[in-house]
Structures are given as C-alpha cells and as structure tokens.
Swiss-Prot record:
SMART domains per record: ARM
Protein name: Sperm-associated antigen 6
GO CC entries: acrosomal vesicle; axoneme; extracellular region; microtubule; microtubule cytoskeleton; nucleus; sperm principal piece
Transmembrane region(s): none
Main location: cytoplasm
Function (record text): Important for structural integrity of the central apparatus in the sperm tail and for flagellar motility.
Assembly description: Interacts with SPAG16 and SPAG17.
Source taxon at top rank: Eukaryota
Organism listed in the record: Homo sapiens
Pfam families named in the record: Arm
Keyword line: Cell projection, Cilium, Cilium biogenesis/degradation, Cytoplasm, Cytoskeleton, Flagellum, Microtubule, Repeat
Length: 509
C-alpha cells in the first residue's frame, strides 16, 4: 500500500468526522430531531469531537452542543453531567475566535435555563475566562461572552454578584461604547440584568460610569438598543431615591419623552417604566417629571397604545397622584382621568383594569374637587360593576372597592352619588349615605333635589341596624327635613293614610 493510499484513509476519516458533526449541527436546529439525537448518544460523541485535532470540527461540535443545550434544561443538564464544561472553559482561553464564539454560546445555552445550571458554569471557573473574552479584539467574541454573562447574572443576586466579582461590569461599560450595535445591545442588557437584583448591584453599575453612557444613547435610532438602554436605566432607578436622582442627573429629561412617541411598542413601554421608577420615589422627583412635561407625554402615550404597553404609564400616573393634592391636580389638568377611565372600560385584562382603578383612586382621594374630577367621567358605576362582578379577579375587586371608597369619602358631587343609593351593596352604601349626610345640611338646593329625585324616599327604605353608623347617617339626613316629609316618604305611609281614610267619619251637617 502506497503512502498516498495510507493518507487517503486519514483524509476519509477526517471527511467523515466533518460531515458527521456538520449534519448533527444542522439536525439540532429542528426540534423534532432533538429526542432522536439524544437517544442515539450524541452528547458523548460531540464531547470527543471537541478535542478533535481539526479546529473546524471542534467549532462545529461546540455549535451543535450549544444548539442542543439551548433546546431544554434536560439537554443542558446532560452537557454538565458529561463533564463538557471544564473542557470548554479550558479551550475558551486557548483557541481562536471562531471556537471562542461557539464555546461561549454553549455556556450561554446551558446557563439560561435555571440558577442551578448557571451555578454549574460559575463552579467550573468560566467567569474569569468569559471576562477575558470581553477584552478580545473581535467584537463577535465580546458579544458572545456578554450574552453568556448576562444569562448567568439574570437569575439572582448571588449569581449577579459572582459576575461583578469577576470584573465584568467595567468591561461591559466599555462594550456599550463600541461601534457595533449588536454588542451595545447585549452589553446594555447584561448591565440591566445585573442592576435589577439589589441596590448594591445597581450601585456597582453606577460606579462603573454606566449611567452617563447609557443616557447619551437614548436617542439612538436602533429600537432594540433603545429598549435595552431604557430597561437598564429603569433597573438602576427603581431601587432608591439616590439611584433615581443619579439617573435624572444624567439629563435624561426631556429626551426620554421622545421615546414615548416611538413606533416600537417595547421602547414606549420601557420609557414609561423608566419615568414610573423615577416618579414613584418622592414628591420632588414626581414634580420634576411634571415640570419636564412627563405627565402629559405619558397620558398621550397611554392613548396611543393598548394592553400591557399601557400598564407602566397607568401606574406612573397613580404614583404621581398619590404624592400630593397638587401633583394629583397636575394629572387632572393634563386630562389623565378620562384616559384612565377609557383603560378601565376598554382593557380586557383584569390586571390592567386593576392598575387603572388604583390610579383613579389615588387621584380622587385628596379633596372634593379631585373626587368630582373622577366622578364626572362616569367612572364610579364602572368601578362598582367591576367590584360586583363574579368574573373579576380578586385583585381587581379589591382595588375597585378601595378606589370607590377613596373617591366616595371625598365626593360631594351628588348626581354621581345618587345612583349608588339604588345599586351599591351595604358596605359601599354606608359611605354614600355618609356623604349625603355631610352635604345636605348645608345646601338647600340639594335638599330639594334629593326629594324630587326620589333620594329621600330611597333612604327611608334602607334597613340599618339601630345604633349603627349607617343609622346615624340616615338620622342626620332626616333631620334636614320636616318630620311630615320624612313620614310621607317612609315605607308603609300610604297604607297608614288609607287606614285613616277608612276610619274617618265624615262630619254630618
């Protein structure tokens, strides 16, 4: 056998390995093939090919493993059990950029499924190597490493802290300054997932100088990048007044308000979320948002979208209104109440209705003027029907009841109160009658109208426990009228009159 024939055997073996690993990588892209591949023992075969002498075979084997691990947590668990991770981590530091990208993809695919699998990656020493990859010359390697670090950090504070301790944050801040959009996106996303867990982790992101760089990119034309930037700034802002103030000091207003008009729904939602996370902390921060035109802009945004995109804006209006009478009035003046009423009536999802009910309650609870602004939009009957409906979720019922109570206890606008005399259950009726007992003694026109509209008659029909607060309210209302008027409208009075007619003896001339 000649030398050429001998070498041909090796060439054929190499071709067969190449063909096999390429086919497996291709088959792994289709979900219907996954179980068959797993049952055929593909993991152990790919593990061997990771150590192949041919670099392209190594890279394709890593790619195939990543695709399999990405599919479900059982396959990711198999990667861990087959002891593949240490091999990947070792090669990640030694190999070329193509292999690094493929190996980082496997780590990301394993780590995304659960904290336990992410911890397995940390335990095999991958973090230090991934952080080194963030300094790689190739942007694709940086991007792959940032993906893997993000998927580890997002699970919980402990894993995030491990990523921070490995020195990832300053390098991720450098990555958001790189020209490649894809790298900027994933670096911003990783910073967001680190910051979300605790004030301390968010402070680490701030200390690395991330906020100023993120704020400068709010107007970047790439929607996905804006989505991630706004998310990262929200995750920093949400934890404390100090962190929210640091974000505000990066001069995000008024530029962030332009994002509320963006074509992309996620950009709108995340911009609303950022404004909410700032406004919720203090009256001063809410006032800053109002002064920047944030309340009016959020109300316009709520009007231009539907569903969950509306939710953070609805909550933001509630937070602003909750702080003070003046801030609640700012929401009213900006026509926030009609928009919230529309959400309450139109939105099919109970959790969005519940948020709108809560926000309306926060607006109406301050003074009679605030309560009237809510009542004139015909919101109270809608809240009552949501509270009474058996189809409403428990949370929606609770929030509707609380909103009704908040508004009723300040409401002196009687046309809005009167329908409640007929429709409200006893626990709500008490508050309605209470409001009439406050207004009627001081308003002669209202007293007359209360008689002609049938309100006084209805009050006489209410069965109240003797000595109860409700009975006190009824007595207070009755004391506003002559005794014979109260008797005239009391149940059974017509029968009494008829008895008197029957028993009356005409005087004979």
């Amino acid at each position: 056998m000649s030398q050429r024939q001998v070498l041909q055997v090796f060439e054929q073996y190499q071709k067969a390995r190449t063909q096999f690993v390429q086919m497996v990588a291709e088959l792994a892209t289709r979900p219907q093939n996954i179980e068959t591949l797993q049952n055929a023992g593909v993991m152990s075969l790919l593990r061997t090919l990771l150590l192949d002498v041919v670099p392209t075979i190594q890279q394709t084997a890593a790619l195939a493993l990543g695709r399999l691990a990405n599919y479900n947590d059982d396959l990711a668990e198999a990667v861990v059990k087959c002891d593949i991770l240490p091999q990947l981590v070792y090669s990640l530091a030694e190999q070329n950029r193509f292999y690094k990208k493929a190996a980082a993809f496997v780590l990301r695919a394993v780590g995304k499924h659960s904290p336990q699998l992410a911890q397995a990656i940390v335990d095999c020493g991958a973090l230090d190597t991934l952080v080194i990859c963030l300094e790689d010359f190739d942007p694709g390697v940086k991007e792959a490493a940032a993906w893997a670090l993000r998927y580890i950090a997002r699970h919980n504070a402990e894993l995030s802290q491990a990523v921070v301790d490995a020195g990832a944050v300053p390098l991720l801040v450098l990555c958001i300054q790189e020209p490649e959009i894809a790298l900027k996106r994933i670096a911003a996303s990783a910073l967001s997932d680190i910051a979300k867990h605790s004030p301390e982790l968010a402070q680490t992101v701030v200390d690395a100088g991330a906020v100023a760089h993120l704020a400068q990119m709010i107007l970047n034309p790439d929607a996905k990048l804006k989505h991630q930037i706004l998310s990262a700034l929200s995750q920093v802002s949400k934890h404390s007044v100090d962190l929210a103030e640091m974000v505000v000091e990066a001069e995000i207003f008024p530029v962030v308000l332009t994002c509320l008009k963006d074509k992309d729904e996620y950009v709108k939602k995340n911009a609303s979320t950022l404004i909410r996370e700032i406004a919720k902390h203090t009256p001063e921060l809410s006032q800053l948002v109002v002064n920047a035109g944030g309340v009016a802009a959020v109300i316009d945004c709520i009007g231009s979208c539907k569903g969950n995109t509306r939710l953070p804006g609805i909550m933001m209006l509630g937070y602003v209104a909750a702080h003070s009478e003046n801030l609640a009035m700012a929401v009213i003046i900006s026509k926030g109440v009609p928009q919230l009423s529309v959400c309450l009536s139109e939105e099919p999802e109970d959790h969005i209705k519940a948020a709108a009910a809560w926000a309306l309650g926060q607006i109406g609870r301050h003074t009679p003027e605030h309560a009237r602004a809510v009542a004139v939009t015909n919101t109270l009957p809608v809240l009552l029907s949501l509270y009474m409906s058996t189809e409403s979720s428990e949370d929606l019922q609770v929030k509707s009841k609380k909103a009704i109570k908040n508004i009723l206890q300040k409401c002196t606008y009687l046309p809005a109160l009167e329908p409640f005399l007929y429709d409200a259950p006893p626990n709500i009726l008490k508050h309605v009658v209470g409001q009439f007992s406050k207004v009627l003694p001081h308003d002669s026109k209202a007293r007359r109208l209360f008689v002609t509209s049938g309100g006084l008659k209805k009050v006489q029909e209410i069965k109240a426990e003797p000595g109860s607060l409700l009975q006190e309210y009824i007595n207070s209302i009755n004391s506003c009228y002559p005794e014979e008027i109260v008797r005239y409208y009391s149940p059974g009075y017509s029968d009494t009159l008829l008895q008197r007619v029957d028993s009356y003896q005409p005087l004979n001339n």
